[in-house]
Amino acid sequence: MTRRFFSLISALLSMLLLLAMPVNAEENTSWDKQFQTQITEWKDAIANRDPGFKEWQHSQTEIQTLGANQRQWLVSIKKSGKQVGYLVVGETPNSDSDPKSKFVLLEYGLGEYILFDDAFAPREIAAEPVYDGFASHWLLTQNPASHMVNAKTGEPYPTAFVANEPVMRTLPSNELVHSGQRLTQTRLLKQQEADPFDQIGWVHQLQSTSEITWKQLWQQQEGSSITLTVPLHHSKVLAPFVVSSLHLWDDQNAYVGVWDEGLRFVPYTYAKKVGHFYLNQTSSPAE
């Protein structure tokens, strides 16, 4: 094969690459615009409907990817240089009939300390963020053994603890908030952050098989004490959370807000799948 023929092939390949670059750049720009538009819509919808999120108004966002090839992003919400909350956004697979990206709202929270906060992040370079609702963690894979660190509190777990199979990604997209939906109803139960051990009626109900439905949750009055317990890492840990607020999107998609170093909202269908709700009947630890 002559050198001239090699030069011709090289020129053709270079031309094809140059022709493809504007297309790829245009696709990336379109995706970025869709993503930014969507997170702004959700942020404003929450801030304008729930007075507790008023600080989100006129705020700024920073975005980071969660894990490798997970199609999940952490959106840090800041105002005047201070963190005031976060969103966790996922992307559903595109279809040939609808190539437009479809984003879903996996979780959102309020407060100074967000999920995967740098203040609690392990200093090891090999720490990988792994998102799965309440089971979210940093995975440290360095020798001699891998172990996990709680993504909300920075608490390290023993090396013997192993994560369950992810649950959040198994939820149908129609059970999650998606593009075009509005926050239509809110219900406040506990305005101030509370410790689940301040009222321990739920401890005496751990063996109960009765279920609290969404309708029953929604009917509770402000001041009601509801505890959500979630077994983590193959039931090595039982994590209790006090329910603070309830959100309803388009009057159909329900999210539950719990106190956990700040306020965090997860889909009700997820919370019900991984945990159990208890209505506390006692008023103090002594009881």
Predicted segments, located by residue:
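A short, surface-exposed interaction/processing loop segment used at functional sites
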Residues: L87-A135, V149-Q185, A254-E287
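Sec-dependent N-terminal signal peptides of Gram-positive bacterial secreted proteins and lipoproteins
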Residues: T2-A25
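Short, non-transmembrane alpha-helical segments in secretory-pathway proteins
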Residues: E26-L66, G109-A126, S173-T229
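Soluble extracytoplasmic regions of secretory-pathway and membrane proteins
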Residues: S30-Q38, W42, Q83-G90, E107-I114, ...
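Exposed beta-strand-loop-beta-strand "reactive/processing" segments of non-cytosolic proteins
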Residues: P51-P93, Y131-H147, S245-L246, G257
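A eukaryote-biased signal for long
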Residues: Q185-E287
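Extended intrinsically disordered terminal tails
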Residues: M1-T2, V266
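Generic "edge-of-domain/loop-turn" microfeature
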Residues: P22-N24, K82, D96
